Amino acid sequence: MSTGTLYDKVWNRHAVRELPTGETQLFVGLHLIHEVTSPQAFGMLEERDLSVAFPARTFATTDHIIPTADLERPFGDDQAETMLQVLERNTEAYDITFFDPSSGAQGIVHVVGPEQGLTQPGMTIVCGDSHTSTHGAFGTLGFGIGTSQIRDVLATQCIAMEKQDVRRIQVDGALGEGVYAKDIILKIIGELGVEGGIGYVYEYGGPAIKGLSMEGRMSICNMSVEGGARAGYVNPDLTTFEYMKGRPHAPSGAAWERAVDCWQQIQSDPDATYDDTVTFDGSAIEPMVTWGITPGQALGISEPIPDPARMDSGDRATAEKALDHMDLRPGRTMEGVNVDVAFLGSCTNARITDLREAASLLERLGRPVADDVRAMVVPGSQGVKQQAEDEGLADTFREAGFDWRGAGCSMCLGMNQDQLEGRELCASSSNRNFIGRQGSKDGRTVLMSPAMVVAAAVEGEVTDVRRLMRET
């Protein structure tokens, strides 16, 4: 087993007791909830006449079903209106802070937590959402949990978990122009597979990781679960502390100095031991795209789509299904594949630096969205939306032909009205390309970085953004 890692230190600090099942009871530092996975948990509390143990450690927002075009109440979608009303009642009844649509702070739960300063190094964080691993970018242990576990955390502020092994993922070198954090994580998942991380927590490190912004680190940790890992994290450093300082719920004054001292102590020791280590050359990574129906079916923009006939039987059936669904053939690259929709959003890539990079590229290219492409930008939070508007980014997107929307999960999972239609193919900055993920059972999704989404939007087809950059 690993020793001296951040994972070991944070785990041990939060361990309450060992259970007869072999699991460890862990105290939860922060519990984030939203409108989709929390109602049943609150219902179970009521059935057992239980209360919320630590309401000050629970924070709520609405993101999955909220409309991004019109927030006038009641919502046009009756189900969305009902789910929001239930969350309003539950948070009021149990004295839980709720970042509601009128607060100016509503947004995707994994965007709101960090920008509010709720996410802090050394915490254990849980949420009824797979991508809670996002918070690991701050040196936390972030775990997605199910409804019964949400109930348990509400009632006890604890969770039962098995300890995982730790795999160090070292990314050396420097990224080239047109290559971003999204490309790093797609490369990792493409190489290690969607089940490669089962039984592991990933620790990301190396020069390429250290050089990323906090938003970039969040993109990488966000998709750890897509590679099978239970969580992923980056050791906190000066970049982490600079991002956090001054945020609404971050420590301040003398408490800030004490907190930084504490956070530095949880970093993995220089002589920490890992259960496995995998190394990547960041300078060799090119813009990545998916060609299939899992995030693991990813390749560089210049690489040919693999031939299922050359795969082992375990991968062959999935690859054949993917090619049939995507209407692709082996041997060709993804460059030149026609795009119907361009989606810039999700808890992976809808933060302010993502929007800045995308808007900057649009200005550099000086070109509008292609005539036959439906393009939208969905900021990760109302805070991101306001900042983007203040900086003029929203105007850049609108002038180029992007639809500028309100904050929410939107087309990442198609639970509101933002959905693909029929066989549309979407160039998407989101995290999952499963069949039916974006609202249409026949819709097709190609995952890529925000810059690659912009390139696809203006060209009308999947495009190597580096070529466009060289031409301007």
Curated annotation (Swiss-Prot):
Reactions that this protein is recorded to catalyse: (2R,3S)-3-isopropylmalate = (2S)-2-isopropylmalate
Sites where the protein binds [4Fe-4S] cluster: 347, 409, 412
EC number: 4.2.1.33
GO biological processes: L-leucine biosynthetic process
Domain of life: Bacteria
HAMAP family in alphabetical order: LeuC_type1 (MF_01026)
Descriptive protein name: 3-isopropylmalate dehydratase large subunit
Naturally occurring in which organism (per UniProt): Salinibacter ruber (strain DSM 13855 / M31)
